[in-house]
A protein has these predicted regions:
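Extreme N-terminal, non-catalytic leader segments
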Residues: 1-7
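P-loop/Walker-type NTP enzyme "switch/lid" segment
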Residues: 7-13, 20-22, 27-102, 106-112
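Hydrophobic anchor at the start of a short beta-strand
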Residues: 32-34, 100, 126, 153-154, ...
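Conserved beta-strand segments of the P-loop GTPase G domain that flank and frequently precede/overlap
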Residues: 102-103, 126-131, 156-160
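Inter-motif core of Ras-like GTPase G domains
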Residues: 111-134
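Conserved C-terminal guanine-recognition region of P-loop GTPase G domains, centered on the G4
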Residues: 137-151, 156
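Beta-strand-loop-alpha "switch" segments that mediate conformational coupling across diverse proteins
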Residues: 162-213
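NTP-binding/hydrolysis catalytic cores, primarily Walker-type P-loop NTPases
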Residues: 205-241
Length: 241
């Protein structure tokens, strides 16, 4: 079983969107057994999206089977003692799931659930989305340093990329991270308003926990699929190596 999380200690990087899309890609495209743990208090974005989508599906089709969806567990008790219980329970799920995707709170201090899970070695891979600004670069580098100190495998990638920005600038930052022993994916995800919209009954969405909108993704941000394939291949190597 592989445990993956798109995670950033800086808000607004799109981590929850990528966690949702990865889980949907694994379940609805690859046919994998997937569970999502939602620890992202107080908003619990993934849980609220699932509730809204499931209600909509039932209204459209009363015979809809919610068991056909991957489960999203909302973890409301984020105390240190309970997170220890969650970590122990997680290690007992290997027979039931191929992947567990965890959406963590967007902060990293030693009292956080995120840090506790990192320190416990829960994750097969941490994937760090980053913006090309000073604060985003600094935050991502600091998180990479924490992962390195804990022996946690991780992969960085650029999100919200504007193609008119100079490619040389991205290359410079990639070299900066490489000098620090940090791997940056070559798959840069371009900026898209649609990527920030939940399913709303129209074609103008990319975020969904009840399907993977392959047509819309391929038409707008096909690099997401390439990124996911890289993430899964890298996690697979770490899991077996």
């Amino acid at each position: 079983m592989q445990v993956i999380s798109f995670f950033s200690a800086k808000g607004g990087t799109g981590k929850s969107t990528f966690n949702m899309l990865l889980a949907s890609y694994l379940k609805y495209v690859l046919g994998k057994r997937v569970m999502v743990l939602d620890l992202d208090a107080p908003g619990y974005n993934l849980s609220s999206t699932r509730e809204r989508e499931a209600d909509g599906m039932l209204q459209e089709n009363p015979s809809f089977d919610a068991n056909s969806l991957y489960p999203i567990r909302k973890i409301e008790d984020l105390t240190r003692s309970h997170i220890k219980v969650e970590i122990a329970d997680l290690r007992n799920l290997e027979e039931d799931y191929d992947y567990v995707v965890i959406d963590c709170p967007g902060s990293l201090v030693q009292t956080d659930a995120s840090f506790q899970m990192l320190a416990a070695g829960v994750f097969t891979l941490i994937v760090i989305p980053m913006d090309i600004d000073g604060m985003g670069i600094a935050s991502s580098y600091s998180l990479g340093e924490v992962c390195k100190s804990l022996g946690q495998p991780f992969l960085l990638f650029f999100n919200k990329v504007y193609w008119q920005e100079k490619k040389e600038l991205y290359a410079q930052f990639e070299s900066f991270f490489a000098d620090g022993g940090m791997r940056v994916s070559s798959h840069r995800v371009k900026n898209s308003v649609k990527l920030r919209r939940d399913a709303d009954g129209t074609a103008a969405y990319m975020r969904s926990s009840v399907c993977f909108p392959m047509k819309e993704i391929k038409a707008t941000v096909p690099e997401i699929i390439e990124l996911f394939e890289e993430v899964l291949a890298y996690a697979g190597r770490r899991d077996t190596g």
